[in-house]
Amino acid sequence: GPLRVCFAHLGDVRQKGADLYARLAEAFVDKWPEAAIFYGIGVPASPVVVPIKPMAQAALDAFYAAEVDVYVSLERLGEGNGWPLGAEAMLAGCVLVTTDVAGMNKRNGYDFGEHVSIVELDDGRESFADIDAVLATLHGYATDRGRLATHGRRAQDDAYALWGADAMLEPIWRHLESCVFPEAPMGPSCSAGGND
């Protein structure tokens, strides 16, 4: 079947790059009409983007896992924004194609490999610096399903290592363990009557 690509946002159309996604989808379908289906939540009307209604998080996670191969995030804003929707899609096993105007990939020490494709925008953040490169990335996944599957697993593994329950809960478990099995006298946050 066709490559399944998705973009989602509920914010400002321009800041989130929804217009860029519509342009990308239209350019892809012009070149390879049968190679991909493009889903969009919050995307401007486009003849090639299948609109999807916003859904609750559990339903969205299930949708990503069952219906999406590549998640596209085209943030223009920069500082103050991360990849929350991209991280959710990666946790579901989707390959991520994203802008990184805030430098999240390197600044936070992620430095993902080729299974997270960083998309460059022009200096004014109005358009893609090289839309042909983005189209080639997507077409590569449409024609090489083995690579798509490998990159989806790597993206999911990386996402769980960074944002999965074990990674998020580890500091809490360490704190609780130090309270239950202290090597030194318990600090105020561990004391039995600390909240009285």
Ranges and model annotations:
Residues F7-V13, E75-R76, L121-G124:
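Conserved donor-binding loops in enzymes that form glycosidic bonds
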Residues G146-E177:
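A charged, aromatic-enriched C-terminal amphipathic alpha-helix characteristic of glycosyltransferases
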Residues D61-A62, P84-L91, N105-K106:
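Short alpha-helical segment that forms part of, or immediately flanks, the ligand-binding pocket
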Residues G42-V68, R76-G82, A102:
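Conserved active-site histidine-acidic residue motif and adjacent donor-binding/catalytic loop
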Residues V95-T98, N105:
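Short hydrophobic beta-strand element within catalytic cores of glycosyltransferases
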Residues D69, L91-C94:
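A short alpha->beta transition loop at the rim of the catalytic pocket in nucleotide-sugar-dependent
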Residues G1-M55:
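Conserved catalytic-core segment of nucleotide-activated headgroup transferases in glycan assembly
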